[in-house]
Curated annotation (Swiss-Prot):
GO terms for biological process: coenzyme A biosynthetic process. SUPFAM superfamilies: Actin-like ATPase domain (SSF53067). The keyword Kinase applies. The active site is at residue 102. It comes from Cellvibrio japonicus (strain Ueda107) (Pseudomonas fluorescens subsp. cellulosa). Substrate binds at residues 93, 100-103, 179. This is Type III pantothenate kinase. It holds the Pfam family Pan_kinase. Catalyzes the phosphorylation of pantothenate (Pan), the first step in CoA biosynthesis. Homodimer. Belongs to the type III pantothenate kinase family. The gene is coaX. Its EC number is 2.7.1.33. Its main location: cytoplasm.
Amino acid sequence: MILQIDMGNTRLKWRVKNKLASLVEGHCLWSDAEDALMASLMPYGGLISRILVASVRSQEDNQAFMQLLGRLTPLVPEFAYSQSHNDGLVNGYADPERLGVDRWLALLAGYDRHKAYPFMLMSAGTALTLDLVDGQGHHLGGYIAPGLDVFVRAVSHSAAQINVVKSNNLFDASPGRSTVDAVHHAFAAMLSGLVQKSYELLSRNNGFAPVLLITGGDADVVKGLFHQGITCPDLVFSGLDIYFDLRAGNNG
């Protein structure tokens, strides 16, 4: 069995899989990681043969997490890192290792599903990222913006007369008729404009309408803005399969 772990900015996700299927999946906030992870994985500790990790956390956090895993199994976790290229996909960053590994793994999975077609990959979480890939497998770069929660909190904390709590009903980019709507609709309008600009760029240069893939903790929230978008909740895990060459069934 293989334990896959996605160490994000705000949340921790994990799954245990064998050659046939996922056996257990879970996620939690970092503040709950110790109790949630141990409760979920303790029955599988002696059965796990590999631990594969995608982390955007600091080295200190990674070390602390490895110590936590040491209570479960003596195995040494294997960390994925961003690459210049893999499986026909070319990293568009001038310094490929600077691309977040979660973005790289999700791009690998997206490219594996949509080879020969351009696509946009949106990850909606603490940060919102949008990456562009053309029909030849060239990553053209991307955009990084505040996620919805960060955007709402930034506006509320910076303006004394604005006190808004995040809403998950994000489906309208028209002018807001209340402060709450004005803040949320502004985010929706900016995100819609970013996607439209990227859509036009990829369509013009590739001759095909690009696919929009949406992942991340707020994927279901932003999906309401883009009816053509495809929600893909486990792209990072699928990318780990590609990175560690597990697609042929060598899953432990």
